[in-house]
Amino acid sequence: MNRERLIPLLNEIAQLLQSNGHPGQAEYISALATVAEWDVTAVEPGLVSGAIWGGSGSVWDVAQFNSREERRRFMHALLRLVDEMRQAGIKAPGAESSAAIMTSWLTSGII
């Protein structure tokens, strides 16, 4: 993975989560950014985890945001994360299905 793109992206996602009242999810993403600073190859298990791409309570599943604009920024950041994972050859079915759903929502204007 490209450390120069991944760490700022993870920090952006964590900041959006924190500023919108999701401290637990923000802490998880911040921890991944810290791991990536030390060893970008060690972050893969965390990136494919259900903590990000799983069901209720996962990072991608948070729904409450201060504005529609912030929620859209959050989803676009997650889509960039999926792109980074693809470029690195990381296979994550949960990420792929979540990306398809978010893309559909963003394209249709639901979000």
What positions do the PLM features span?
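Short terminal alpha-helical segments
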Residues: 1-33, 97-110
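Amphipathic alpha-helical binding modules
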Residues: 60-111
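Short, charged early-sequence alpha-helical segments and their helix-coil boundaries
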Residues: 39-75
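Intrinsically disordered, low-complexity segments enriched in small/polar residues
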Residues: 19, 48, 52-55, 87, ...
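Solvent-exposed, well-ordered amphipathic alpha-helical segments
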Residues: 3-6, 43, 81-82, 88
